[in-house]
Amino acid sequence: MDIPSILSTCKPDLAPYESIYKDLHKHPGLSLQEYLAAETAAKGLRSLPGFDVRTNIGGTGLIGILKNGGDKTILLRADTDALPVEELTGLEYASKKREVDVEDGIEKPVMHACGHDMHVATMLAAAETLHKAKEHWKGTLVILFQPNEERAGGAKAMISDGLYDLSKHACPAPDVVLGQHVMWFEAGTVGTRVGSFASAADSFRVTVYGRGGHASQPHRTVDPVVMAAHIIVRLQTIVSREVDPREAAVVTVGSVQAGMTENIIAGEAVIKINVRTVTPETRTKVLAAIQRIVKAECEASGATKEPLWESTSSFPFTNNDKKTTETLSEAFLNVFGDKFDPETGPLGGSEDFPILATEAPNKSGGKGVPYCYWIFGGVDPEKWKDSVENGTDIPINHSAYFAPVIQPTMATGVDAMVVAALTFLK
């Protein structure tokens, strides 16, 4: 039986998975606090006879292993965490949740503003489809639900917790690792590309030190707010004046914090910086420029001591394996036709997904197996058409208004994941 026939025969009714999606969307969990998503994923996998489910890997991470003969192993990955965003979609199942973030102890609004709830529901439906289609494929299927993607810690944590240690979690090393992400493109579409597909990302918390005092006596202080302001403005020149225009890079200061009230000059300021780059050379150059600028501005301002640098996250480059991606693209083209784009432009965002492949043991005795990552659209086709024709705004990932239309988004995501799995297991 060919793959399109397997899809039409074995794909389950998606209504229960739509309900799962709505429940997860209404009750999200911040990074490191994805308890409902993990519970839901484990319950779904355990409902399918034959899956060996292992939980609490690197936090709330879990896997389901289905052995079905053969000698090939593939790993399918979905992420589970939400974001500190106050939802403004107006959906009947919108999140109203607030919770204390275990990272900093601050209470925050929580929203699935990046679609990871869709990833969980879609993966569970794909798992059921593949379970029903067991007679049509051979090999070992590993379904992995990963926490803490947004802060780039989940994949590393699962690896550090012995994900591929057979004696600990019984997870065999995969021959190929596959993953997908819902994005702000037309629902029903799928896209990927060979090679560079997502940028590297580096985030820092930088503390600069002045000398606090009374607001009426600035001459007796060293104002860290002014110091931070000079740093922020100067950082904007890195991309415009130091990066080759043929390259791509982004330097964003997403948070600045100093002082408690207007009549006191603070003693220090904290700047949170996020950097995106698409080549190792540019990454090295931009990070060096940031350090140079911060150090120089602190010295020029008379800082009382050297700035404190703290790395808060680091995402690798996502470089899709050529052979794997070309093989999968052929299969996607056969199923999705002109709704599939094999030359999708590089994503501005970043992923820790590749770590699950680059840290996997391979048959040569080293580390690193092939991987492919792709996207599927979540925007209502009519809204997409209106945006193309009239320029109306479409909320993007991480927006308080980001709300994938449930169908055909979910059906497309299920089909894509099943097609990918069967392509390497048939």
What residue spans do the PLM features occupy?
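Short Gly/Pro-enriched turn/cap motifs at secondary-structure boundaries
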Residues: 53-54, 149, 194-198, 344-348
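General structural feature for long, well-ordered alpha-helical segments within catalytic domains
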Residues: 2, 13-20, 33, 37-41, ...
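Divalent metal-coordination and catalytic microenvironments
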Residues: 24, 64, 76, 116, ...
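Histidine/acidic-residue-rich, glycine-tolerant segments that coordinate divalent metal ions
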Residues: 83-85, 94-111, 117-118, 129-252, ...
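Acidic/His- and Gly-rich active-site-bordering loop/insert found
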Residues: 1-112, 117-125, 129-139
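Conserved hydrophobic/aromatic beta-strand scaffold that supports enzyme active sites
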Residues: 63-65, 205, 373
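Metal-dependent amide/peptide-bond hydrolase catalytic core
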Residues: 226-426
